[in-house]
């Protein structure tokens, strides 16, 4: 049997409904889990009872523990003959079960049993999992027959716990009850004793069904031997707006924080802004001063940059110290002189933290003040420093520019590039499609050889993108008509360069002339109206081509005719269409008003595997990046923490619900001054949330698994705790979005080919990488690549299997209907077959009822499935992706580069495997084509006898159907199709035999 048990401690209840004639109630609690029912004692005439009773349920199958549900029903006892008035219930999902070391009492609001029932109040429970073999499951006691059995009596229970460093905790409980009561004893070695607590007797009523017994050979798995959990877990954190329970915000007694930060936990910081100093003394022998400031609280120390030979420096740097980690009651701000061997002391200012004032936005920023520095003897000097010290939260304006105490590797932060640690917001550039059409050229003359007719082509270049036309017929006035599409970013930095070149040899091209068109001079359009052509003179170099005055003086030169336009009616894809976060066109004129607001609270993360080693210990330096639309956000980097806390909140405007929010976690490899530029930030995991799967107004608080697929297999590197809320500002506009096209209309009027879209998407990603790489701190290439996920289009045997499984799953419903119809036709269930006959007769007799019946049936199914609607947003499914049990060679092939770098024998093996799979696909495609060719052969006279038979049959059937009512024909056909097995033959029917004998084009295949 499994050693895992579910422990439930019933602590108390408050605010219960008063259901008896004395305006009170006598509550008791029934706990139900896995066909096991336990009952707490009855508290007579107490609407705010206190129990402190603990029960242990047997977990029969730990592998499905996350799918189980614990139910706690609260009733009021009246007498043994009356019904129990219902006071409320609580449902706790299995995904919320945690080890005992992490469990804490929680007040669950009581829910109604049905629409017409009433419920009020809260029930305080403590739910946990334990695998301690010394803890025995609760044993049922007989339910007394008399009302006196429910009277309360004083009982005591001593609980002693064994706490280990991991998540599981071994418990030893000894219950001492009065005589005439049943006592349970559990013995185990004691390490740490908890305070004495009073518990009540464990009562249990008989369940309506016998408990399920599962026999397991061998010992059961421990809590840490369970398979890895790749599912999403619902959490109930205490955020700024209150406790989140089931998507609802339960307000507490404390004053809520500002609504701007109601999706994150409030974090308090001590902010120190070092502005500047003046009239500092000279310390060096040369009569100069290289000042810098040290801000110190306990063991935390922040250091500003130093200035060379400056007695009036200006720093304007902010330091933030987490108030829950402060190790001293005093703040020291020291000014020092940078020296080669030992830095000299200049002066110091001390602050008592108890005197520091608090500031909460929307209060104005705190004005800095001048403070006179003291020497080591405490004497005031004439040189001063300007400081501002205040207590605030992450809602403060200085939060984004501050250097945090958890971002310091050691006591000296001078080797830290603080810019790479701060939270920032990025905006990707607005992308346009540039459509260029090369028409013709005139007077193309080769100066070196005027007698030779040139073979010219045009090279079109925009930034790093370059395409070329085909070779026309040799002529001095060539014509092309080729059209090209590029991606450009606004604000426009690159120009359109047209270069005419002469192909003189197989590997030799000589320039004829160049023309430069400024991007701002190109017209823009938002529809499919024709755009105008232009003539341009060719110059010898780009500098001459950009000289406007010289172009006006040219009397004779080679001319090029072209068309160019910026298409603003398209949406430029920079990510996969199915995972797009924005579908708006490039032109702002076509943008519609926003339909809602998306709010994201990045709470914290749990990193299971260290990403690097520092000072002989494994650690991680993590940050979070989220993308939606044109807005990218990056959280601050938390140094040396496997459980970082961010508590940062961001908002986006939503223009379409059929979009996806992408969040990724990375390990920072570029924060130290000694880090080289060749290092890459390693991804820890990714989360995608589709907005259309979210209920408006609900707060989704979940722990998402961070999964990364590597050549060694699927790894769960941690969990990311998020709070997401989608608020709709216009319900009618959002509902109308479901009737609108997904993409702008230009994608349907002048569609781009699939290959063209993929090429343009890669150009767009490269442009975004370049633009975001210029920011400070830069958003690096590996981050953009991982968020856009452009590698998903590459071949993968794993994805091929997963997509084929999805294909079969989609049609599994139709296959089930076909199997059910076979059972109807074979009369396996005569009652069902008879009912189908009756229904079929009604539909044929009244055909106008067919469509209403079908749509009514679908409506009823939809309403029935509302009870089972998904409660969690969808997440990356390891089983659906075939990532949990994939072949190592297939993974190695998936991570191979282009071109391959594997050994020839491995490539040969993979090629042969691909050939075998392709051969099966080829055979299936040929069989499908053969069936269609047989249909065509019915009237093609390829088989004259078969066609003659079919034509004669059609003529006879036409005459018969003309004189026979259609309803009669339909009834007879249906009855014949569902005829009894005694009227059937095992051999194929005549129509099937006739169809299989028809010829196909397979005979003509080589």
Curated annotation (Swiss-Prot):
Binding residues annotated for Ca(2+) 1, in chain numbering: 284, 290, 337, 339
GO cellular component assignments: cytosol; plasma membrane
Reported tissue expression: Expressed in incipient leaf primordia and roots meristems. Observed in flowers.
Main location: membrane
Residues the entry annotates as binding Ca(2+) 2: 284, 337, 339, 344
Molecular-function GO term, any one: metal ion binding
Membrane topology field: Multi-pass membrane protein
Cofactor section: Ca(2+)
SMART domains: C2 (SM00239)
Chain's role: May function as a signaling molecule by regulating the trafficking of other regulators.
Family: Belongs to the MCTP family.
Protein known as: Multiple C2 domain and transmembrane region protein 9
Species assigned in the record: Arabidopsis thaliana (Mouse-ear cress)
Gene: MCTP9
């Amino acid at each position: 049997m499994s050693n895992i048990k579910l422990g439930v401690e019933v602590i108390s209840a408050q605010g219960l409904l008063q259901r008896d004639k004395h305006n009170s109630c006598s509550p008791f609690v029934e706990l139900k889990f896995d066909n096991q029912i336990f009952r707490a004692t009855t508290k007579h005439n107490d609407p705010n009872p206190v129990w402190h009773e603990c029960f242990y349920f047997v977990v029969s199958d730990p592998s499905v523990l996350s799918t189980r549900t614990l139910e706690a029903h609260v009733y009021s006892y009246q007498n043994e003959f009356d019904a129990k008035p219902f006071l409320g219930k609580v449902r706790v999902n299995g995904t919320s079960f945690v080890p005992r070391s992490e469990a804490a009492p929680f007040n669950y609001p009581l829910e109604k049993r049905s629409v017409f029932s009433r419920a009020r109040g809260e029930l305080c429970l403590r739910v946990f999992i334990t695998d301690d073999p010394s803890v025995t499951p609760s044993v049922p006691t007989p339910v007394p027959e008399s009302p006196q059995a429910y009277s309360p009596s004083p009982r005591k229970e001593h609980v002693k716990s064994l706490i280990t460093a991991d998540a599981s905790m071994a418990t030893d409980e000894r219950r001492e009850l009065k005589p005439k009561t049943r006592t349970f004893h559990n013995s185990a070695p004691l390490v740490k004793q908890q305070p004495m607590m009073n518990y009540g007797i464990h009562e249990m009523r008989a369940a309506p069904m016998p408990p399920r017994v599962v026999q397991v050979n061998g010992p059961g798995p421990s809590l840490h031997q369970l398979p890895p959990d790749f599912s999403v877990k619902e959490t109930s954190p205490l955020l700024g707006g209150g406790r989140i329970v089931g998507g609802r915000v339960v307000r507490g007694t404390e004053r809520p924080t500002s609504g701007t930060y109601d999706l994150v936990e409030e974090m308090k910081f001590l902010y120190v802004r070092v502005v500047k100093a003046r009239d500092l003394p000279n310390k060096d022998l040369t009569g100069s001063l290289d000042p810098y400031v040290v801000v110190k609280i306990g063991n935390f120390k922040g250091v500003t940059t130093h200035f060379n030979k400056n007695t009036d420096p200006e720093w304007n740097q902010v330091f933030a110290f987490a108030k829950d980690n402060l190790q001293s009651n005093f703040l020291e701000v020291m000014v020092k002189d940078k020296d080669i061997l030992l830095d000299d002391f200049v002066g110091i200012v001390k602050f008592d933290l108890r005197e520091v004032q608090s500031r909460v936005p929307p209060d104005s920023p705190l004005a800095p003040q001048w403070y006179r520095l003291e020497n080591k003897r405490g004497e005031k000097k004439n040189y001063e420093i300007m400081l501002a010290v205040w207590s605030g939260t992450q809602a403060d304006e200085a939060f984004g520019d501050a250097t945090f105490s958890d971002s310091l590797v050691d006591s000296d932060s001078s080797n830290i590039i603080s810019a790479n640690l701060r939270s920032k917001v990025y905006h990707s550039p607005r992308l346009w499609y540039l459509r260029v059409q090369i028409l013709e050229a005139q007077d193309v003359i080769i100066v070196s050889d005027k007698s030779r007719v040139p073979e010219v082509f045009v090279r079109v270049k925009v930034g790093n993108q370059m395409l070329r036309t085909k070779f026309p017929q040799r002529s001095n006035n060539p014509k092309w008509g080729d059209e090209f599409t590029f991606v450009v970013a606004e604000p426009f930095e690159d120009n359109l360069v047209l270069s005419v070149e002469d192909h003189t040899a197989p590997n030799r091209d000589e320039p004829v002339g160049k023309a430069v068109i400024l991007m701002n001079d190109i017209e823009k359009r938002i529809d499919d109206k024709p755009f105008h052509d232009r003539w341009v003179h060719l110059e010898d170099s780009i500098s001459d081509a950009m000289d406007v005055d010289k172009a006006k003086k040219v009397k004779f030169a080679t001319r090029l005719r072209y068309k160019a336009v910026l298409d603003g009616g398209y949406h430029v894809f920079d990510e996969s269409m199915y995972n797009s976060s924005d579908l708006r066109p490039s032109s702002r004129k076509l943008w519609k008003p926003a339909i809602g607001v998306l709010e994201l609270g990045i709470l914290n993360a749990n990193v299971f595997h260290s990403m690097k080693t520092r000072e002989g210990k494994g650690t991680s330096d993590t940050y979070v990046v989220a993308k939606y639309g044109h807005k990218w956000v990056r959280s601050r980097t938390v140094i040396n923490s496997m459980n970082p806390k961010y508590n940062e909140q961001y908002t986006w405007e939503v223009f379409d619900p059929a979009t996806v929010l992408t969040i990724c976690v990375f390990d920072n490899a570029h924060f130290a001054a000694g880090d080289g530029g060749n290092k890459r930030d390693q991804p820890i995991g990714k989360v995608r949330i589709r907005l259309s799967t979210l209920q408006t107004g609900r707060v989704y608080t979940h722990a998402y698994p961070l999964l990364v697929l590597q050549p060694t297999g699927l790894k769960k590197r941690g969990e990311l705790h998020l709070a997401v809320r989608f608020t709709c500002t216009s319900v009618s506009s959002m509902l109308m979005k479901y009737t609108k096209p997904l993409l702008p209309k230009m994608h349907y009027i002048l569609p781009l080919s699939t290959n063209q879209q993929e090429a343009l998407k890669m150009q767009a990603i490269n442009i975004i990488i370049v633009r975001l790489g210029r920011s400070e701190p830069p958003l690096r290439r590996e981050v953009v690549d991982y968020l856009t996920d452009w590698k998903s289009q590459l071949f993968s045997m794993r994805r091929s299997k997963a997509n084929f499984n999805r294909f079969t799953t989609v049609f599994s419903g139709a296959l089930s209907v076909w199997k059910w119809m076979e059972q109807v036709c074979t009369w396996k269930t005569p009652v069902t077959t008879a009912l189908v006959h009756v229904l079929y007769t009604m539909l044929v007799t009244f055909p106008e009822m067919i469509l209403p019946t079908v749509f009514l049936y679908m409506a009823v199914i939809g309403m029935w499935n509302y009870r089972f609607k998904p409660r969690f947003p969808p997440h990356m499914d390891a089983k659906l992706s075939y990532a949990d049990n994939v072949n190592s060679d297939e993974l190695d092939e998936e991570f191979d580069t282009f071109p391959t770098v594997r050994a020839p024998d491995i490539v040969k093996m993979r090629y042969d495997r691909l050939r075998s799979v392709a051969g099966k696909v080829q055979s299936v495609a040929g069989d499908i084509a053969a069936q269609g060719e047989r249909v065509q052969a019915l009237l093609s006279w390829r088989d004259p006898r078969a066609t003659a038979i079919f034509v004669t049959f059609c003529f006879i059937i036409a005459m018969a159907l003309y004189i026979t009512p259609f309803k009669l024909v339909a009834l007879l056909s249906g009855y014949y199709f569902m005829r009894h097995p005694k009227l059937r033959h095992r051999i194929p029917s005549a129509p099937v035999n006739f169809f299989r004998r028809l010829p196909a084009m397979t005979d003509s295949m080589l």
